[in-house]
């Protein structure tokens, strides 16, 4: 099922010289976001910078949010991940989508104009209210945390 997403193009190169965000394959969960830079940016080891995507989005549906995730190849091969590890865009946000890129690697890395820098996944959201209780119903796991279910 495809649903329309309101996108405002802020950089006129987007959709022309720089492709619009797109799914790489029919089975892709994430849209590839691209760097809308005036010129390439070199990230030194340990450095973080905000990279513009050239677009603003407005999800408008409180039952949706957008998550920004790193591209696995950039992280594994070059140490380029998101500075905030995961980005979360609320349904009522209408500003430019920026990607915080962090070079956690040992070598400088240059981000080229139009390079795919992150993935955006649209996810359902359920807003909850709290109900105060004295106890929970029993479960097989109980209060077991960190490693309590074993390694096998």
Curated annotation (Swiss-Prot):
Binding site for substrate: 71-73, 84, 88-90, 98
Pathway: Pyrimidine metabolism; dUMP biosynthesis; dUMP from dCTP (dUTP route): step 2/2
EC id: 3.6.1.23
Protein name: Deoxyuridine 5'-triphosphate nucleotidohydrolase
Signal peptide region: none
CDD domains, per database record: trimeric_dUTPase (cd07557)
Reaction it catalyzes: dUTP + H2O = dUMP + diphosphate + H(+)
A GO BP annotation: dUTP catabolic process
Role description: This enzyme is involved in nucleotide metabolism: it produces dUMP, the immediate precursor of thymidine nucleotides and it decreases the intracellular concentration of dUTP so that uracil cannot be incorporated into DNA.
Cofactor(s) required, per the database record: Mg(2+)
Recorded coiled-coil stretches: none
EC class (word): hydrolase
Disulfide bonds: none
Species annotation: Hahella chejuensis (strain KCTC 2396)
Upper classification of the organism: Bacteria, Pseudomonadati, Pseudomonadota, Gammaproteobacteria, Oceanospirillales
Keywords: Hydrolase, Magnesium, Metal-binding, Nucleotide metabolism
Family classification: Belongs to the dUTPase family.
Single GO term (MF): dUTP diphosphatase activity
């Amino acid at each position: 099922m495809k649903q329309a997403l309101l996108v405002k193009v802020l950089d006129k190169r987007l959709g022309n010289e720089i492709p619009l965000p797109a799914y790489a394959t029919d089975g892709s969960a994430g849209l590839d976001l691209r760097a809308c830079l005036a010129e390439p940016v070199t990230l030194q080891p340990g450095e973080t910078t905000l990279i513009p995507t050239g677009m603003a989005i407005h999800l408008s549906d409180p039952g949706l949010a957008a998550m920004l995730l790193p591209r696995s190849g950039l992280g594994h091969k070059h140490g380029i991940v998101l500075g905030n590890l995961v980005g979360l865009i609320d349904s009522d946000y209408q500003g430019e989508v920026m990607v915080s890129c962090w070079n956690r690697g040992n070598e400088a890395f240059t981000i080229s104009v139009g390079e795919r820098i992150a993935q955006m996944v649209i996810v359902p959201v359920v807003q909850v209210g709290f109900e105060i209780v004295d106890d929970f119903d029993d479960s097989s796991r109980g209060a077991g945390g960190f490693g309590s279910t074993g390694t096998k």
